[in-house]
Amino acid sequence: MWGKLMKQSSINRIKLRQKVNINSIEMFKACLQYNSQFQPKVKIELAKWPMYFEYWEYLEKHENIIPFSIKTSIDNLTLYGNLLKSPLKNENNNKTIILLHGITNTRFWIFKQAFIFLRAGYNVIWYDARNHGESDASPTTFGLKESQDLQDIIEYCCKTYKQETTALGLYGFSLGGATVVMWSNLYAKHKINQKVKFIISDCTFSRLDRTYSEKLYNYAFLPTNLMLKLSRKKAQKTFGVDGLQEIQPIKYLKLIPDMPILFLHGQNDHFINYTNANELFQEKIRYEIPKKSSLYTILDANHGQSFLIGDLDHTVVNEYNLVNDKGISDTTLEFVQKWINT
């Protein structure tokens, strides 16, 4: 029945109550099983941006790109990634930011963020998540298994690249943002995690079931409750949990009261509503004395455009609803510099 419903949901057959991104609905459903269309071609994203592609070629020419692969501890999948060493020599060269991409992307999709950190002297570690890019195929679990994969990456890289990993920061976009927040459940369980000084969560969800429900509501031909029931059964079979309501990054924030988090979100996000970022931020600061975390939303920015739009002549607003006087890249680097040396 599930497969039949997926076939019925083609763009030619649905009727919409309001404007909605069809691909985002298909994405949520298809990620509950392995789907080959979510294996993008490696590096194709860089070709769209000549400046970044040129910088990548510069890194390649100077041997600043070190490939690696690891086996996941929970199911022995192979994940592929790189250590990108900053060509700028300064006091940040022994510090590294780990970047996590979003659903249907590869690590190359977030090269703009890597570019920002590399130009400031920080190294970057990035990798393709399970079921994405070069990494092995396996159902996407929206942060459940991906958070353990992140722990595996941290342990491998700290052991292998000791000189570059005296201090770490985590950046996650969308699915990656959920992963870095849900990784909080592992923070206190491994001594090596004390090297992680901050988290940046960019346009992720606070509760997956609610985000999914918001998308399903726009289907006029199917009751939302029916689709949620089917999703719950599929999630239980795939993830081993009782439905999508179990995937709630917000419930993990209390586990890291002393970890500063920078929450970013575009106010024009049609995939995940920007109110999720405010909800996550408000929950996080409940446990902070003094307050360490920050929230910035970007007017006119859609999903994944925080840095693209936030560095142009568009308004960036902080948690007090005051207009920020700097672009999102400079604001992010200030946050990184403030906390990575603590």
Per-range role (PLM):
Residues 278, 282, 286-342:
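C-terminal catalytic histidine-bearing segment of alpha/beta-hydrolase fold enzymes
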Residues 270-276:
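Conserved alpha/beta-hydrolase "acid-adjacent" motif
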Residues 106, 132-166:
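Catalytic nucleophile-loop/oxyanion-hole region of alpha/beta-hydrolase
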Residues 185-245:
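Hydrolase active-site cap/lid region
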Residues 114-136:
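Conserved alpha/beta-hydrolase
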Residues 94, 102-105:
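Active-site glycine-rich loops that stabilize anionic/oxyanionic intermediates
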